[in-house]
Amino acid sequence: MTEVRVRFCPSPTGTPHVGLIRTALFNWAYARHTGGTFVFRIEDTDAARDSEESYHAILDALRWLGLTWDEGPEVGGPYGPYRQSQRRELYLDVVRRLLEAGEAYESFSTPEEVEARHRAAGRDPKLGYDNYDRDLTPEAIEAYRAAGRPAVVRLRMPDEDLTWTDLVRGETTFKAGTVPDFALTRGNGDPLYTLVNPVDDASMKITHVLRGEDLLSSTPRQLALYAALRRIGVADFTPEFGHLPFVMGQGNKKLSKRDPESNLFAHRDRGFIPEGLLNYLALLGWSLADDRDVFSMSEMVAAFDISKVNSNPARFDQKKADALNAEHIRLLEPGDFAHRLRQFLTEHGHIGADVDEKVFAAAAELVQTRIVVLGDAWDLLRFLFAPADEFTVDEAAAAKNLGADAVPVLEAAIAALEPLPGWATPVIEDALKTALIDDLGLKPRKAFAPVRVAVTGSHISPPLYESLELLGRELTLARLRSGLEWARQ
């Protein structure tokens, strides 16, 4: 079997979106599964829309997710350069060879002339190009040139059905005549995507083209161009094609770049970890097993088969994505989780380098099973790490839990904790249970809610006794006294 070579070739426009990264993931997984090569190529031929900022955002996204490429920008490879903007001379040479071989021709018709011919023949004026210039005489061509009329170069489409066996959708046919001769260049001679994409695939020996369903309709054009490229010696073979299902958003509409959940970095900013997001993106068209949604990337690579990709549209379900991310957070080794959480909270400006490493690791362990995304952790840990002058008590929690009936509870808690010889979780737990449950006869919720709110500022926190140990005796007692003052008002 020929070594599998797949490619991911985004245009550097805008912010990376989940559909784009799903395509990268499936190509990467197929390359790793087969022991093949994952080629990363940048399609930056649209100077008006392309940006270096977007280019670097794509690099950032792939690196964050661990989707490493074998050939491409910043890595190199035998078929470079890997940016289309640096390959212009190659494309122009291919255009010249196609023209010389009669595979392509110059077309001078304007859109207005094409529409007029359709109307005159009683056809829909929006049908598109009508192949009129295929058989222009040399005299007509010279007359157009003498008049200074620009020409696009068009490929001669075959007068026969175009059929291929799609790796996802099975046998697919476009009837003869349904795809007109299409432009390979602009009127100014600049090569178009319709030319450069297959030429790059051919020159980089791409064996499998795995891409979104939105590009399905361009496949007949690419097949016809490949046939011409093989006849002129540019291509050695025609790759296999597989079209991945649409990703749908709310209301069963195709997920748009404008939909917030489509923005890859919005998920990262919330605190998704790569394992969780990749696991969910893998499920947008593929599954490891019917009864198993949670899996690692190594498990995906071992099992990934492009023929098992579902052709039906996949719906982006934020709740399911969140749930999978929570599962992957729980699966992290505690030290790894603490490192990632610390990095996240530091990058978001919540904590600084002065936070004690052991204290942070212990705090992280308390919240690892209680969060969905890393961003959830700050609300739970703010009471420990926010500067003292920024500590506040949630007003709704205080109104409910720091009323007059909290006075005896907080007085008893202070009296129980003040004289403790040591400050460790078991000692704190024993002292509070004795003072509040045994001596005051309170139910646990009534006993501990005022303590929790006074000390953490919220009715939701990590486990109480462990939290008090980490906060320390001095701060714990100070906050209990402040809570007592509040309750007495």
From Swiss-Prot:
Q: Which residues bind ATP?
A: K257
Q: Provide the protein's localization.
A: Cytoplasm
Top EC class, one word: ligase
Q: Which cysteines are joined by disulfide bonds?
A: none
Where primarily located? cytoplasm
Origin: domain of life: Bacteria
Motif: 'KMSKS' region; annotated at: 254-258
Per its record, the protein catalyses:
tRNA(Glu) + L-glutamate + ATP = L-glutamyl-tRNA(Glu) + AMP + diphosphate
Whether DNA repair counts among this entry's keywords is no
Asked whether the keyword Protein biosynthesis is assigned, the reply is yes
Alphabetized, the UniProt keywords read: Aminoacyl-tRNA synthetase, ATP-binding, Cytoplasm, Ligase, Nucleotide-binding, Protein biosynthesis
Q: Which GO terms describe its biological process?
A: glutamyl-tRNA aminoacylation
Residue ranges annotated as motif 'HIGH' region: 10-20
Q: Can you name one GO molecular function term for this protein?
A: ATP binding
Query: One Pfam family name from the record?
Result: Anticodon_2
Q: How does it assemble?
A: Monomer.
Q: What does this protein do?
A: Catalyzes the attachment of glutamate to tRNA(Glu) in a two-step reaction: glutamate is first activated by ATP to form Glu-AMP and then transferred to the acceptor end of tRNA(Glu).
Q: Which NCBIfam families does the record cross-reference, listed alphabetically?
A: gltX_bact
What's the family? Belongs to the class-I aminoacyl-tRNA synthetase family. Glutamate--tRNA ligase type 1 subfamily.
Instruction: Report the protein name in the record.
Output: Glutamate--tRNA ligase
Question: What gene is it encoded by?
Answer: gltX
